[in-house]
Amino acid sequence: MQFSCDPDQEGDELPQYEHIYQNDFSYRKHKKQKEEDISICECKFDFGDPDSACGERCLNVITNTECTPGYCPCGVYCKNQKFQKCEYAKTKLIKCEGRGWGLVALEEIKAGQFIMEYCGEVISWKEAKKRAQTYETHGVKDAYIISLNASEAIDATKKGSLARFINHSCRPNCETRKWNVLGEVRVGIFAKESISPRTELAYDYNFEWYGGAKVRCLCGAVACSGFLGAKSRGFQEDTYVWEDGDDRYSVDKIPVYDSAEDELTSEPSKNGESNTNEEKEKDISTENHLESTALNIQQQSDSTPTPMEEDVVTETVKTETSEDMKLLSQNSQEDSSPKTAIVSRVHGNISKIKSESLPKKRGRPFSGGKTKNVAQKHVDIANVVQLLATKEAQDEVLKYEEVKKEAAVRLSSLYDEIRPAIEEHERDSQDSVATSVAEKWIQASCNKLKAEFDLYSSVIKNIASTPIKPQDTKTKVAEAGNEDHIKLLEAK
């Protein structure tokens, strides 16, 4: 996306700030990375393949973690230390018409490429709120405070990098990402798409409006929201007036469903059942008829329902008391306004549902109109072992069962170790849990899945290849008297 900026226009009156190349910690000391928390990748550098040195397939790159110098197997050839080495893309600070200063690319930037770090003063959220109020009181228009984690923020107003000049856009070509660098969480600017030279860089501020002046957005995008934070709930509640009948709050457009009966849109089944979309269309087409004949519905509710009423699909049913039913009946008879039509329609639907038997729960429909039968019980290993004739087969299944139990116990104990950090840091737990503990959790989860796979594979293999233990005479006689009992077939 091209913006209205001239890279050849240098401009003047650069805002006063201190340029820094890494975050400044004033209220606390820099975290010292513990050796047990260092994440070591498994990359091996190949001189014939330059991308082998911690490229896109590096485990640390995948988890947004930079390699620690001295611990990476690729050594000095490691390419996953861009934050530490300040390997930024070439950019230029320019003056944008009507939008202050901005940053443009001076080279071709690939999608996903690291552009630069957003640096500033790392402060607590309490201090960030104080500074925001101070900036507003003194009329500071350009405040650069962004969220770092649940307890800290980055303020680039007085100290910062060139990333502080990147403007907002409703259709951005960049985005912010959090990376773990030597034990600290740092924010980087990355390209969302390929960016050509002389193109302005922009990312979505995700501004949340809580009151005060409304700042008009000047990004110029086709789908521009008009104001910063226009999509936030507070902005919409303060700006727009919701009138009766506004389709943005229409109940018909709100998907109400029971989680136990979560139905997906599918093709009509072979037995003639219509899909969810067809039922909703019938519901909408029927409402117009119900509104025009609201008083008639009140009288017909106790009698046999008409074909038109049978097409109405009620998604949620609430049990009403007899007093509520009488109140609805009185309201529908006293007033013939549009409001009465709505009340009468609801009353008619409730009376109709009360007089009829409730529909049975249907299974979740799948493609082709077939219903998937989900198993409700786990495999009973004890019963499986009794069916196996050889001692070797029984011992093998029991061995894998014991391994599965040990893996489950190990995973449960690790969760008890991680849980305090999750409860303390809530949504930012991924930034606070030690890397070594996270690696143990992943390893324990994989071991549990492998143990389950080995167990069930052993069961299937032994049942298919091992003769079934013959049943005694008493069991056969008991089965002969029960026609519905499942009988085992023995291979001869």
Curated annotation (Swiss-Prot):
Ranges where the Post-SET domain occurs: 213-229
Record-level GO BP terms: DNA repair; flower development; methylation; response to UV-B; vegetative to reproductive phase transition of meristem
SET domain boundaries: 84-206
Reported consequences of knocking out the gene: Late flowering.
GO molecular function, one term: histone H3K4 trimethyltransferase activity
Principal subcellular localization: nucleus
Domain AWS: residue ranges: 36-87
UniProt keyword Transferase present: yes
E.C. number: 2.1.1.354
Stated role: Histone methyltransferase involved in regulation of flowering time. Required for the expression of the SOC1/AGL20 gene. Required for histone H3 trimethylation on 'Lys-4' (H3K4me3) at the SOC1 locus. Prevents trimethylation on 'Lys-27' (H3K27me3) at the same locus.
Protein name according to UniProt: Histone-lysine N-methyltransferase ASHH1
Annotated source species: Arabidopsis thaliana
Organism lineage: Eukaryota, Viridiplantae, Streptophyta, Embryophyta, Tracheophyta
